[in-house]
Regions:
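Short, intrinsically disordered/low-complexity patches at protein termini
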Residues: 201, 209-224, 397, 471-473, ...
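Short coil-to-helix leader/linker segments, especially the first N-terminal amphipathic alpha-helix
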Residues: 215-246
C-alpha cells in the first residue's frame, strides 16, 4: 500500500522538491540566506498547489503543469535578480502592467547572461529528474476510479486540510503580532505580510510563494467601515501647514510655477570633467543656462560685486533611489501607490467626479485658477500618462506625439516617436513652447510640469539621438576646432579631414580621458554622449527662460529643476562616483541635482547669507522629490494638510535631529519604491538591519531614525488607503 501511494505521489514530490531547490537558489542569489523565516507559511502554499494539481488523473498532465509552474519560478528568480542588480528592487504586481515600458527601456546591459545560463541548467536538471520520475509513474496507468478511490480522496483532503489549516494558522499568528492601529504595527511582521512597503524584508520572511500570495491578497483594497473611519480621522487630525509669520511663506504668492524633471541628471553634468569635485566645480561653458539659474546673471557679468543676491536655492543633499514614474508622482501627487501603479488608482476605471486627487499639485493649483499642463518630450502613452494625468488634475496633457505646428499638423510622426529617437531637447522646447508656457499667461497664472528625455540612457553612440549628433564634436574639441552648421543643426569639425592628433581636446574631454581612460575606456565615450544630452536639456531650459523674459513674466515665475534618479544605465554614475554595481545603500550615489529659482528668494537670500561667501541659498537638509509640493506651496503661501504629503517644506523645522561629525542635521526619512528606507546617514530594508554611511553606528541615531520612519510608514499606509478607496472627498481638513 505504502509503495503504491508513494508511486502515485512521485509527481507531487517532483514539484515540491523542485520548488524548494529553486527557493534555495532564490535566497542564495539575493543574499537572504537559505530559506524564509516563516518556512512553514511558504511550504503550506507549495503543498496546497502540489495537491491541487495532483487531483488531475493523468501523470503527464501533472508533470506538464508542475514543470510550467517551476518555469515561472525560474523566471521570477531572474526577474528579481535583475531588478535587484539594477535598482535594489524586487518584483511587485504593478510591474506586469509596465512590461511594454520595461521592454522599450531594456538594453543588453540589463541582461545577465551568466545567471540565465546557470538558472537554465538548474531548471533542465530538475525537469530531467522529473521526467525520469514520470516514466516510473507511467508504468502504472492511472484508472480514474482508482485515482478517486476513497483512500486517495481522504489523502488529498487530509493534505489539503493540513496545508490550509497551517497557512491560516500562520496568518492568524502573524496578524496577532500587532494591531493595525498600534504603535508597533509598522515595525512588525504583520505589516510586512499585509503590505509590500518593504519588499526585501517581506520576501526574506515569507519566501517566493508566500510573498506572491501576500501581494495577491493585498490587491483586495476594500476596507471595512472601521478602517475607513480611522483613515478619514487620520487626515482630519492632520496639522495644517500655515506658517504665515515665516520669512518664506507666501513670498511667491500668485506666481507661475514650472517644474522640470531632468531625466537621469547628475551634478557632474555641469562640471569640467573633474567629477570627484562634484557640485563645487560647475562649468559655465557646457551648461550656461543652469549655471545662470544657480549663480544669477549679475554674477556672470560682475562676480566680484559684494551686493549680489541671487534668487536660487541649491539642494546639495537631494536624494532619489527611484525610477522616473515614481519621482514624477512624488512631485505631482506627493506619493506613489505601493505595489500598484498609477493606472490602478487613476486609470481608465477611475471616476473623475470623485475628485479623489484634488490634493495633488495640479489639483490644488487648478482650484486656485491656475492653468495646469503636463508636457513630456516622449510619447504621452508611455506609463499610460494619457490615461492617468488628467485624473491627477492636469487640464492639458501633451506628449511629443501631441505637439502641433501653427497649421495644426503634428510636428513629430513615424520614427520620430520611437524609443531612443530623441529630438534635440532644445528644439522640442521651441516646438512645444506654447504648451509649456500657455498663450493665455497674461490672463491667469499657470503651472507646468515638464519631463525631459534627452539624457536618458543608454549612453552608447546613437545616431537617432539628436543632441548626441548636435554636440558630440563640441564636447570633444570645442569652438577652436568646430563650427556650428545652421543647416544640419550640429557642431562639425572645421577641418573635416583632420586627424585626432591635429585636434585639441577641450578641458572637459581632456579631464575625462585623464580620469577614466585607463580604468574604463568605454566610459569616456559614454560620458560624451551623456554630456550631449545634458547640454540639450540646458538648451531647453534656456528656451523657456528666454520666452519668460520675452513675455516679461520671468520675475513672476517660480522654477523648480530636479533629477529623477542617478544615471544607472551602463552603470555610468557608479563608475564616475566610484561605487560598486551592487551598492544600493549608498547615500552619495543617489544624491542628484535639485534647484529652485524663485523671485521671492532673492529678498530672503539677502537676509540669510553673506554675499561674499555664497550667492545662492545652500540647503543641506536631506531631501527628495517628496518635498517639492510642500516647498512650492510654502513659497506660494498655500496652506495644506501635512498628513496628505510624505514630504516637508525645505523651510520647515523638523522634530528630530542628530549629530553628523559634529554638525547637527535634521532627521528626514525617505521611502524608496525601489526598496529600502533612508535618512542622511542610515539605510535599512527591514527595520532590523542598518547600514551606516558617513558616521559611526549610533543607537541614538537608530532610535530617532526608527521613530521618524514609523511616522512615515503610518502616513504611507493611510495615504494608500485614501488613494485605493478614493476617500479624499470625505476629508474635511483640506
Amino acid at each position: 500500500m505504502l509503495k503504491t501511494v508513494l508511486s502515485k505521489l512521485l509527481m507531487v514530490m517532483y514539484f515540491v522538491c523542485g520548488a524548494l531547490i529553486l527557493e534555495a537558489v532564490t535566497f542564495h542569489i539575493l543574499g537572504m540566506g537559505l530559506m524564509p523565516e516563516y518556512f512553514g507559511y511558504n511550504f503550506a502554499i507549495i503543498m496546497f498547489l502540489a495537491i491541487l494539481i495532483f487531483i488531475i488523473p493523468n501523470f503527464t498532465a501533472q508533470y506538464i503543469i508542475y514543470t510550467i509552474i517551476l518555469g515561472v519560478q525560474v523566471i521570477m528568480i531572474y526577474v528579481n535578480y535583475s531588478l535587484y542588480m539594477i535598482y535594489g528592487d524586487l518584483f511587485s504586481i504593478d510591474m506586469i502592467r509596465l512590461l511594454d515600458e520595461a521592454g522599450a527601456a531594456m538594453t543588453s546591459n540589463f541582461i545577465y547572461f551568466s545567471v540565465i545560463l546557470q538558472l537554465v541548467l538548474v531548471y533542465i536538471a530538475i525537469v530531467v529528474v522529473g521526467f525520469m520520475m514520470l516514466k516510473k509513474c507511467k508504468k502504472d496507468k492511472i484508472k480514474i476510479r482508482q485515482h478517486y478511490s476513497i483512500f486517495n480522496v481522504i489523502l488529498i483532503l487530509a493534505i489539503q486540510c493540513f496545508a490550509c489549516t497551517y497557512y491560516i494558522d500562520e496568518r492568524l499568528y502573524i496578524n496577532s503580532l500587532a494591531d493595525v492601529d498600534s504603535a508597533d504595527y509598522v515595525s512588525s511582521d504583520t505589516f510586512l505580510m499585509n503590505t509590500s512597503f518593504m519588499k526585501y524584508g517581506s520576501y526574506s520572511k515569507f519566501g517566493s510563494y508566500g510573498y506572491i500570495t501576500n501581494l495577491l491578497m493585498g490587491m483586495n483594497d476594500k476596507i471595512d467601515e472601521e478602517v475607513q473611519k480611522a483613515t478619514i480621522d487620520y487626515f482630519n487630525s492632520g496639522e495644517k501647514y500655515n506658517y504665515t509669520d515665516s520669512e518664506v511663506f507666501g513670498i511667491d504668492s500668485g506666481n507661475n510655477v514650472i517644474v522640470i524633471m531632468m531625466e537621469s541628471l547628475e551634478w557632474f553634468c555641469f562640471g569640467d570633467g573633474n567629477y570627484d569635485s562634484g557640485f563645487n566645480n560647475l562649468s559655465y561653458e557646457l551648461t550656461p543656462n543652469i549655471y545662470s539659474l544657480i549663480y544669477g546673471e549679475d554674477y556672470l557679468t560682475d562676480p566680484n560685486n559684494e551686493n549680489l543676491d541671487n534668487d536660487s536655492l541649491v539642494a546639495k543633499k537631494f536624494f532619489a533611489k527611484s525610477k522616473t514614474n515614481y519621482s514624477e508622482a512624488y512631485a505631482i501627487l506627493g506619493n506613489y501607490p505601493v505595489g500598484e501603479g498609477m493606472t490602478d488608482i487613476a486609470g481608465d476605471s477611475y471616476d473623475s467626479s470623485l475628485n479623489a486627487f484634488n490634493y495633488s499639485m495640479p489639483g490644488v493649483l487648478s482650484s486656485l485658477g491656475y492653468n495646469t499642463s503636463y508636457v513630456h518630450s516622449h510619447v504621452i502613452s508611455f506609463y499610460d500618462r494619457n490615461k492617468t494625468h488628467s485624473n491627477l488634475g492636469f487640464e492639458n496633457v501633451t506628449g511629443k506625439d501631441g505637439v502641433l505646428d501653427s497649421q495644426g499638423n503634428p510636428v513629430y510622426t513615424g520614427d520620430d516617436l520611437k524609443w531612443n529617437h530623441w529630438d534635440a531637447e532644445g528644439d522640442f522646447a521651441r516646438n512645444a513652447i506654447d504648451y509649456i508656457i500657455p498663450t493665455d499667461y497674461d490672463e491667469r497664472p499657470f503651472y507646468t510640469f515638464y519631463l525631459t528625455v534627452s539624457s536618458h540612457g543608454s549612453y552608447a553612440y546613437n545616431e537617432n539621438e539628436a543632441d548626441c549628433m548636435r554636440y558630440q564634436n563640441y564636447v570633444r574639441w570645442g569652438e577652436d576646432d568646430c563650427i556650428y552648421n545652421d543647416v544640419t543643426g550640429c557642431w562639425e569639425l572645421k577641418d573635416k579631414d583632420a586627424s585626432i592628433e591635429d585636434l585639441t581636446p577641450t578641458e572637459w574631454y581632456a579631464n575625462v580621458l585623464k580620469n577614466y581612460y585607463d580604468t574604463y575606456p568605454s566610459l569616456c565615450e559614454e560620458l560624451v554622449y551623456y554630456q550631449c544630452g545634458a547640454m540639450g536639456l540646458d538648451e531647453a531650459i534656456g528656451v523657456i527662460v528666454d520666452k519668460l523674459k520675452e513675455y516679461d513674466i520671468y520675475d513672476e515665475t517660480t522654477i523648480v529643476l530636479f533629477s529623477d534618479h542617478y544615471a544607472y544605465y551602463d552603470k555610468l554614475s557608479n563608475r564616475v562616483k566610484g561605487f560598486d554595481d551592487e551598492d544600493y545603500s549608498s547615500i552619495e550615489l543617489n544624491t542628484i541635482p535639485m534647484i529652485i529659482s524663485s523671485p521671492g528668494l532673492k529678498t530672503f537670500n539677502s537676509t540669510q547669507t553673506d554675499p561674499e561667501d555664497v550667492i545662492y541659498i545652500e540647503n543641506t537638509r536631506f531631501c527628495s522629490a517628496y518635498d517639492i509640493i510642500p516647498t512650492v506651496f510654502d513659497l506660494l503661501g498655500i496652506s495644506f494638510n501635512q498628513n496628505l504629503y510624505l514630504g516637508h517644506s525645505l523651510f520647515t523645522p523638523l522634530q528630530y535631529s542628530y549629530m553628523e561629525n559634529g554638525e547637527e542635521v535634521d532627521m528626514v526619512v525617505y521611502y524608496s519604491n525601489t526598496g529600502g528606507l533612508f535618512c542622511r546617514n542610515v539605510y535599512t530594508y527591514n527595520m532590523t538591519d542598518y547600514i551606516f554611511n558617513g558616521i559611526e553606528e549610533d543607537q541614538e541615531v537608530i532610535d530617532k531614525f526608527n521613530a521618524e520612519l514609523k511616522k512615515v510608514l503610518i502616513k504611507m499606509n493611510y495615504i494608500q488607503l485614501l488613494n485605493d478607496n478614493h476617500l479624499y472627498n470625505q476629508v474635511t481638513n483640506k
